A protein has these predicted regions:
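Glycine- and acidic/polar-rich repeat regions and solenoidal domains
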Residues: 1-170
Length: 170
């Protein structure tokens, strides 16, 4: 994020497709995004179909590594490397609010109505977290069809246990 221009909200991610179809984002270095919201290496905004983020190097992004919003179909992250992403601590102390995350899936789709996605995926990514960080994995309730498979997450020995929140509605 930046405060150079007052139209910037002190947030931003390396890239974020929005209402796109059939997009591949690959072979990039996504680094140093900083701010109190978003600030991921990349995030898939709402209204996308068949968006794949693959073969990228991500590091030092305050918000986290991979974010997927609602109302998407067959979108996700595969074959990426993440190093020390998700170092933000939530100022309100809420576990899921603004704290840094490795993977985050939400149902936000532009307004108060929440929208699940179909076929969200995170697979074959390699994630390194040093001992000073404790990012989360968080999937909002009713996020739809989400697959988190075969990812390698390495945390240095003195790091905290990785918190994961996969909630269901009662």
């Amino acid at each position: 994020g930046s405060s150079i221009d007052n139209r910037m909200w002190k947030r931003g991610s390396g890239t974020w497709p929005f209402k796109c179809e059939r997009v591949f984002i690959q072979h990039n270095r996504l680094m140093n995004a900083h701010g109190p919201q978003d600030s991921y290496s990349a995030h898939i905004d709402y209204g996308c179909k068949d968006v794949v983020i693959q073969y990228n190097l991500s590091f030092n992004n305050e918000g986290g590594f991979a974010e997927v919003l609602g109302d998407n179909v067959n979108c996700g992250f595969r074959y990426n490397i993440s190093i020390n992403d998700g170092y933000r601590e939530d100022p309100d102390g809420l576990q899921w609010n603004k704290k840094g995350k490795i993977f985050w899936v939400s149902t936000f789709c532009g307004g108060p109505t929440r929208c699940p996605s179909e076929g969200t995926f995170f697979y074959n990514n390699t994630i390194y977290v040093d001992s000073t960080l404790n990012p989360e994995i968080y999937v909002w309730p009713e996020s739809g069809d989400v697959h988190i498979l075969n990812n390698l997450v390495y945390m240095e020995s003195s790091g905290e246990i990785l918190e994961s929140y996969l909630e269901t509605q009662d």
